[in-house]
Amino acid sequence: MAAVPTYVQVLLPVKLRWIPTYAAPAALEPGQRVCVELGHRRYDGVVWCRQERPELPPERIQPILSVREDLPRVTAEELRFWAFLADYYLCTLGEVYKAAYPLLKTRSEQTAADILTRLQARLEKKNQQLSGKHNERVIQRLTAERDALLAEIAGYCHSERSEESGSFGKPQDDKDGARDGGKPQVRLGAAHREAFLPAIREALAAGRQVLVLTPEIAFCDSMEAFLRPEFGPQLQLFHSGRTPVQRRHTAERLRSGVSALVLGTRSALFLPFRDLALVIIDEEQDPAYKQTEPAPRYHGRDAAIALAGIHGARVLLGATVPSLETLLNIRSEKYALAPVATPAPRAEVIDLAAERRKNGLVGNFSRKLIDAVRQSSGPVLLLRGWEKPEALQEEADTLFPGRDIRIKTLAALKREGADGAAILAVMQADALISRDDFRADERAAQLLGTLGLFAPHILVQTGVPARFSGERSLDDLLAERQQFGFPPCTRLVELRRQGSGEILERHFLPRDRSLAARKADLVSRLAPNTYLDVDPLD
């Protein structure tokens, strides 16, 4: 009796609105890696699901070329996370797979598999040598070499053994999330990082895994300096600045279920966590969490909360000044608020228009800023916007001869820090905030909160002082968004042109039960060479 063929849908790292079906040589499980052909090209794909009754006739279904037992399986939690990203951010599963397993990562896995094959061949040869007759000294040497090979092989295949020994796709209990009533906890204030430590200690003491996200590598560096003294070798870094080998080793460690504290940028969300207990999102308000190109164009904060839900993990968010999205969730009691007592330094706002009217400007410097610098001691950091650095440095040297005056951009400040500056002065704050963005006032409040982390005395020169004065509270801004139907009270979906990113249409969708259907309708009407961007920030 002929064997009944088995069919599976295989996810490929290409943009397809459908998942191809292939004939499998044997029963395969979701997450297994396979080699298939599509359009005369070979791909390493992932088994998405079994298919009992394929839509195509059997003679039109291609066979799987090989099962990649040498590559690690994709976990059930990873597959669920990919499905969330594709569904929420209106992209294809193939685009998510390509982001989660980019070419460099796949090559690194292949390299590891090749090395493992060579090591196993060397081990077999060493065992053959040991089976012969030798004197005691030769036997000791061969035995030591064999044991070294065994240890090296164990380092490459421990994750696969862990995958096979556990129950694939076993759902996590929600004990960590349930302890907080299932709600993410928000820590606000300049010292919010200190509030993360007890939760990290507790998770690691239980032998579990922790993810700490930062918006940029610059924040990773400062967070590493904060965490490394206490958590030492348990701390694993994961971002684009790490080598493929370093990133693969981190992935293997997590896949094996070993306790670890991972510190990374949004790409760390795609790691194969096996026992994730805690997700921390630092500086949750930072727009750098939003992926713009390529798809999936996801927001790291929101994706991290979804990932935590899949794993049943606890969530902590930290910010000096929160995003309005987080504030809305606090006010609607979806999130729990735990303020941190230490306030950020309050900025002194200087009205450039008023200074200009009373001849209070000397080049790019207001009289108030000049007086503040002259009355202070210690280094001064000037945060430039439109100003040319050479011209600004020349002005500073003329006005403050002999003073330690440094000039940086906002990006450099985040990356390098303020170098112990006593004063941090923003030369033209309006250059750092888009005037045409409905989020401008929110961004201004968040900018001041971020600057307060770097220096004790902040001065801000601006042509729009009301924006930076702090007179309008975040609750006022949230009420205004509600009145005019802007996010976060609605969902913004933009239709953009592929390549240029030009905005063709803007859709403000209500946050109700019709949201999913409205998003699906936009996808169905998508024209060639266009794409949809959900929750854009620029």
Where is each model-derived feature located?
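Glycine-rich, charged/polar anion/phosphate-binding loops
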Residues: 264-266, 366-369, 408-413, 446, ...
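Conserved segment of the helicase C-terminal RecA-like domain
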Residues: 303-323, 444-468
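A conserved SF2-helicase RecA2
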Residues: 327-333, 459-485
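Helix N-cap motif at beta-to-alpha junctions
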Residues: 500, 508-517
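Short, hydrophobic beta-strand segments
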Residues: 351-353, 491-496, 504-510
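Serine residues within intrinsically disordered or low-complexity segments
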Residues: 159-167
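Accessory, non-ATPase domains that flank or precede helicase/AAA+ motor cores in DNA-metabolism machines
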Residues: 1-160, 173, 180-348, 352-363, ...
